[in-house]
């Protein structure tokens, strides 16, 4: 988006930094009656804080995450001040904001059949479309791996309980496969905000 906008709801107030957000992610927030405040990629921490959000969500989007300098700065400024959730490129932005690094993958993850392993051993078939990844070993102390890719071992999700940051590399609004199913990322997010 080029200008901030709001999608009203009576639930938790969620600030969203739009890096190219997919409609199903907005629908996932709306399905939980969130009061959604969407901001463009170049928003500042002060602008986000002005809407008094319960949490910040960094969306998916195309391209090299190091180019999202304003979003990286915003996340860096807000880390530890409110819960932050990231998906897809949003995870990469959060990783960079914490001082981690990203790299261009030899073979990007594209399609609705990418298997990821949860830290407890469970497997999800996910939908993904990215050519960059966060280097797991570049993340600072306090970060823990939540998901890894079954095929290549790349990082698919991380969290930092001290800064209240949770991120996934896949599209959490849809599970891969022949029918629409949502991965419990947003349910977990709203349960933690309650």
Regions found by a protein language model. Name each.
Residues 32, 51, 80-81, 141-142, ...:
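Structured helix-beta-strand junction loops
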Residues 13-18, 126-127, 166-170:
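Active-site-proximal beta-strand elements of phosphoester/diester hydrolases
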Residues 1-46, 50-51, 65, 173-178, ...:
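RNA-binding accessory domains that recognize and position tRNA/RNA substrates
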Residues 55, 59-125, 133, 175-188, ...:
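Cysteine-nucleophile active-site neighborhood
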Residues 9-14, 120-123, 160-165:
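Beta-strand-turn-beta hairpins that frame and shape the catalytic cleft
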Residues 122-162:
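Catalytic beta-strand/loop cores that center a nucleophilic Ser/Cys/Thr
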């Amino acid at each position: 988006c080029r200008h901030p906008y709001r999608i009203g709801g009576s639930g938790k107030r969620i600030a969203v930094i739009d890096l190219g957000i997919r409609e199903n992610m907005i629908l996932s927030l709306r399905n939980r009656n969130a009061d959604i405040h969407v901001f463009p990629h170049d928003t500042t921490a002060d602008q986000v804080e002005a809407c008094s959000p319960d949490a910040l969500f960094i969306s998916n989007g195309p391209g090299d995450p190091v180019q999202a300098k304003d979003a990286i700065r915003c996340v860096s400024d807000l880390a530890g001040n409110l819960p932050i959730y990231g998906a897809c490129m949003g995870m990469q932005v959060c990783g960079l904001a914490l001082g981690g690094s990203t790299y261009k993958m030899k073979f990007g993850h594209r399609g609705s059949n990418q298997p990821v392993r949860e830290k407890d051993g469970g497997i999800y078939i996910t939908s993904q479309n990215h050519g960059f990844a966060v280097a797991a070993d570049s993340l600072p102390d306090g970060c823990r791996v939540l998901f890894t890719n079954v095929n290549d071992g790349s990082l698919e999700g991380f969290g930092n309980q001290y800064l209240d940051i949770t991120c996934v590399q896949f599209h959490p609004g849809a599970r891969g496969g022949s029918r629409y199913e949502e991965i419990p990322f947003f349910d977990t997010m709203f349960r933690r905000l309650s």
